[in-house]
């Protein structure tokens, strides 16, 4: 019997953080990366929210996998995800109202995130609850990692702040430094992601296409 963190389970958990990242390798979930990464805080909150939804949706679908009729499995998956997204939305309204307002409709649109349905279809329907939970955590954190990196650079270079705190010294501005207003525009998220993809593929030869 495999241990809770066997080599296979470690690969399931850690693979999405690097060589099988859902955003920069599988090209999933990019749309929300445009919308919520102009600042670091909403990027972190969205990353945590998606991680929670993917992990628990994976577990629920895995537990039900032998009882769900094949012809309605997509509907069941959507209902499970919608219920979890509703819970996450209410929690954010209760404990992080300002960030929830910044995220706006994009919390509700978690249900349309390709990563969610992709993991439910590709993994949870064919694996046990623990493996599915690890897969959800891994893919959620892989997604969150990219959002945080993009949000970090967009807020730092676009506003001179991180988490709302000024980090670029006033002396820089006195000498003529100007924030790059382009960084807070949605197209710059694509460009930052493209740079991350380039760096990632340069470091991982197995991802390079001939």
Positions of the model-derived regions?
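Intrinsically disordered, low-complexity non-transmembrane regions of multi-pass membrane transporters
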Residues: 1-14, 204-210
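Short amphipathic alpha-helical coupling elements at transmembrane boundaries
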Residues: 15, 62-66, 131-139
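Hydrophobic core segments of alpha-helical transmembrane domains in multi-pass membrane transport
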Residues: 30-34, 50-55, 82-89, 111-115, ...
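Structural signature of hydrophobic alpha-helical transmembrane segments
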Residues: 40-56, 76, 100-111
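C-terminal ends of transmembrane helices
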Residues: 57-70, 117-127, 201
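Cytoplasmic-side transmembrane-helix entry/capping segments in multi-pass membrane proteins
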Residues: 68-81, 102-108, 135
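Transmembrane alpha-helix boundary signature
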Residues: 87-102
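C-terminal transmembrane helix-loop-helix hairpin of multi-pass membrane proteins
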Residues: 133-210
């Amino acid at each position: 019997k495999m241990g809770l963190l066997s080599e296979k389970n470690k690969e399931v958990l850690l693979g999405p953080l690097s060589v099988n990242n859902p955003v920069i390798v599988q090209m999933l979930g990019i749309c929300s990366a445009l919308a919520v990464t102009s600042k670091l805080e909403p990027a972190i909150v969205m990353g945590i929210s998606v991680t929670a939804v993917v992990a628990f949706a994976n577990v629920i679908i895995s537990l039900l996998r032998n009882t769900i009729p094949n012809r309605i499995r997509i509907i069941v998956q959507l209902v499970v995800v919608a219920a979890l997204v509703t819970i996450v939305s209410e929690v954010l309204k209760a404990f992080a109202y300002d960030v929830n307002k910044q995220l706006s409709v994009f919390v509700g649109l978690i249900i349309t995130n390709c990563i969610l349905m992709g993991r439910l279809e590709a993994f949870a329907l064919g694996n046990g609850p623990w493996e599915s939970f690890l897969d959800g955590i891994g893919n959620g954190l892989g997604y969150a990692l990219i959002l945080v990196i993009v949000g970090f650079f967009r807020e730092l270079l676009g506003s001179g702040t991180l988490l709302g705190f000024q980090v670029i010294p006033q002396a820089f501005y006195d000498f003529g430094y100007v924030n790059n207003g382009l960084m807070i525009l949605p197209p710059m998220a694509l460009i930052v992601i493209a740079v991350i993809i380039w760096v990632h593929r340069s470091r991982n030869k197995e991802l390079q296409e001939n």
